[in-house]
């Protein structure tokens, strides 16, 4: 099993550049992607947790691209790589708002990446969920649209 600071197999499919450029960016990056957040987790809570590992330079909350409300992820950027490595070691897999959060390397925040990429504006993973998850908006958004009663023909 890989240690926390090694690169995972996940790669952002929207990265602008070659695979080797992406690998290099990830290995030099001070930016982390944080996933599986509750929609109700605040920037202040994230700062409190991640600042235990070093000086946080920037937090960018992930937003629903239509509603501009939190949608369960963020980016955390440190000033130096070693502090980001500490966060990978010690924060990945911990609980925040009663949820196990995932921390992974990110090649660096670029404007526009703070928005969900799903059809309904949030994260793709929340669109098809069949279980109820109160911390992430209930049932999957596309499932909710399919089972919503049709009131047009009444």
Swiss-Prot record:
SUPFAM superfamilies: RNA-binding domain, RBD. MRNA binds at residues 10, 33, 102-106, 113-117, 123-124. It is found in: Nucleus. Its main location: nucleus. One of its GO terms (molecular function) is RNA cap binding. Keywords: mRNA processing, mRNA splicing, Nucleus, RNA-binding, RNA-mediated gene silencing. PROSITE patterns: RRM. Signal peptide: none annotated. GO terms for biological process: mRNA cis splicing, via spliceosome; negative regulation of viral genome replication; primary miRNA processing; regulatory ncRNA-mediated post-transcriptional gene silencing; siRNA processing. GO terms for cellular component: nuclear cap binding complex; nucleus; presynaptic cytosol. Pfam families: RRM_1. Transmembrane segments: none annotated. Residues 30-108 form the RRM domain. The keyword Nucleus applies. Component of the cap-binding complex (CBC), which binds co-transcriptionally to the 5' cap of pre-mRNAs and is involved in various processes such as pre-mRNA splicing and RNA-mediated gene silencing (RNAi). The CBC complex is involved in miRNA-mediated RNA interference via its interaction with Ars2 and is required for primary microRNAs (miRNAs) processing. Also involved in innate immunity via the short interfering RNAs (siRNAs) processing machinery by restricting the viral RNA production. Component of the nuclear cap-binding complex (CBC), a heterodimer composed of Cbp80 and Cbp20 that interacts with m7GpppG-capped RNA. Interacts with Ars2. This is Nuclear cap-binding protein subunit 2.
């Amino acid at each position: 099993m890989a240690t926390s600071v090694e690169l995972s197999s996940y790669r952002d499919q929207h990265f602008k550049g070659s695979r080797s450029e992406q690998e290099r960016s990830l290995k030099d990056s001070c930016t982390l992607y944080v996933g599986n957040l509750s929609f109700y987790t605040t920037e202040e809570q994230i700062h409190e947790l991640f600042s235990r590992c070093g000086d946080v330079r920037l937090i960018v909350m992930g937003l629903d691209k239509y509603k501009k409300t939190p949608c369960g992820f963020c980016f955390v950027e440190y000033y130096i790589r070693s502090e980001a490595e500490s966060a990978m070691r010690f924060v990945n897999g911990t609980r925040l708002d009663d949820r196990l959060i995932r921390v992974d390397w990110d090649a660096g925040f670029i404007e526009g990446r703070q928005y969900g990429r799903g059809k309904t504006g949030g994260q793709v993973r929340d669109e098809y969920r069949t279980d109820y998850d109160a911390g992430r908006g209930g049932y999957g958004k596309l499932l909710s649209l399919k089972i919503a009663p049709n009131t047009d023909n009444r």
